[in-house]
Swiss-Prot record:
The encoding gene: rplI
Organism of origin: Myxococcus xanthus (strain DK1622)
Pfam families for the chain: Ribosomal_L9_C, Ribosomal_L9_N
Protein name per its UniProtKB record: Large ribosomal subunit protein bL9
GO cellular-component term (any): ribonucleoprotein complex
Alphabetized UniProt keyword annotations: Ribonucleoprotein, Ribosomal protein, RNA-binding, rRNA-binding
Cited function: Binds to the 23S rRNA.
InterPro entries named among the record's database cross-references: Ribosomal_bL9 (IPR000244), Ribosomal_bL9/RNase_H1_N (IPR009027), Ribosomal_bL9_bac/chp (IPR020594), Ribosomal_bL9_C (IPR020069), Ribosomal_bL9_C_sf (IPR036791), Ribosomal_bL9_N (IPR020070), Ribosomal_bL9_N_sf (IPR036935)
Gene Ontology terms for molecular function: rRNA binding; structural constituent of ribosome
Coiled coil: none
UniProt KW rRNA-binding keyword: yes
Length: 147
């Protein structure tokens, strides 16, 4: 049985793919749970239309993310924190702190776009990665200063 997946299914395929499955798996699991639709001519045409709409929307979002990356790339933010012995911070600098500091510079970003491989717990200069889109990554310079 050929079906078009409506969502990603592990070990089977990604959303929008045309896959062949056993009849029982399709009839008893995929179709009743609306995880797939039968691969009819009408459904294939609708799939192509949806792919075109998604590609156009994705291109528009990518363009906006690239514009924002150009603006954000020039920003250098400073965050002041209380420190203890050996320049260790009380607490850490989080993605929310960085988002607020960038907002103070005039650019708003979502804290979920900020990628911190590990928490910032010491004074110094850091380069923080912002994943604005799947294909667009910007970097800002962050300086953590003592209060």
């Amino acid at each position: 049985m050929k079906v078009i997946l409506r969502e990603d299914i592990e070990n089977l395929g990604k959303s929008g793919e045309l896959v062949t499955v056993k009849d029982g798996f399709g009839r008893n699991f995929l179709l009743p749970r609306k995880k797939a639709v039968l691969a009819s001519e009408q459904n294939l045409r609708q799939l192509e239309h949806e792919k075109a709409v998604i590609a156009a929307r994705n291109a528009k979002l990518k363009g906006a993310a690239e514009e924002q990356a150009k603006k954000i790339g020039a920003i250098k933010v400073s965050i002041k924190r209380r420190v203890g012995d050996q320049d260790k911070l009380f607490g850490s600098v989080t993605a929310l702190d960085i988002a607020e500091a960038v907002a103070a510079e005039g650019q708003s970003i979502d804290r979920r776009h900020i990628h911190l491989p590990e928490p910032i717990k010491a004074l110094g200069n850091y380069e923080v990665e912002l994943r604005l889109h799947r294909d667009v990554i910007a970097k800002i310079k962050l300086e953590v200063l003592p209060e």
